[in-house]
């Protein structure tokens, strides 16, 4: 895994949390519509009839549990990426700021440039230096683990 992939793990986890939140919201809307339809039919329900409201409720519980796990994973990844970025602060402060704004705050490049008060060419150079420092850390970690 290269430095850019490593740093973007938190972004991907955040996107997954967002998707799961939307899916859970849709399930809540569906359960409301299913509940209102089943109340309107006016027919007696036998024991063999499927229970759509209960099925949706089970899906909601499962989706909520999946969302909880995804949030925990995203927070753990954020902390790991944050610590890795902060570890290069003493070596290159600007690179640390650029990586922090881009990969922790998930800002687009134009906002990163505004936040650190540098032009895009300077920010890009600092970003590459930061990626090189992160890559070195990842390789050192991998070497020490094996």
Task: Name what the model sees in each region.
Residues 111-116:
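Short alpha-helical "recognition helix" segments of helix-turn-helix
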Residues 102-106:
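Short helix-to-turn junction characteristic of helix-turn-helix DNA-binding domains
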Residues 86-96:
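Short helix-coil-helix linker/hinge
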């Amino acid at each position: 895994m290269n430095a850019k992939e490593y740093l973007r793990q938190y972004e991907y986890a955040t996107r997954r949390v967002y998707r799961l939140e939307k899916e859970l919201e849709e399930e809540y809307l569906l359960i409301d519509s299913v509940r209102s339809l089943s109340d309107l039919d006016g027919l007696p329900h036998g024991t063999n009839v499927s229970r759509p409201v209960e099925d949706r409720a089970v899906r909601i519980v499962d989706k909520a549990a999946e969302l909880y796990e995804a949030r925990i994973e995203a927070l753990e990844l954020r902390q790991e990426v944050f610590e890795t970025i902060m570890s290069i602060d003493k070596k290159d402060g600007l690179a640390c700021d650029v990586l922090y704004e881009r990969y922790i705050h998930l800002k687009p490049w134009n906002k990163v440039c505004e936040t650190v008060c540098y032009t895009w060419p300077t920010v890009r150079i600092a970003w590459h230096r930061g990626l090189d420092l992160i890559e070195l850390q990842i390789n050192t970690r991998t070497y020490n683990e094996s």
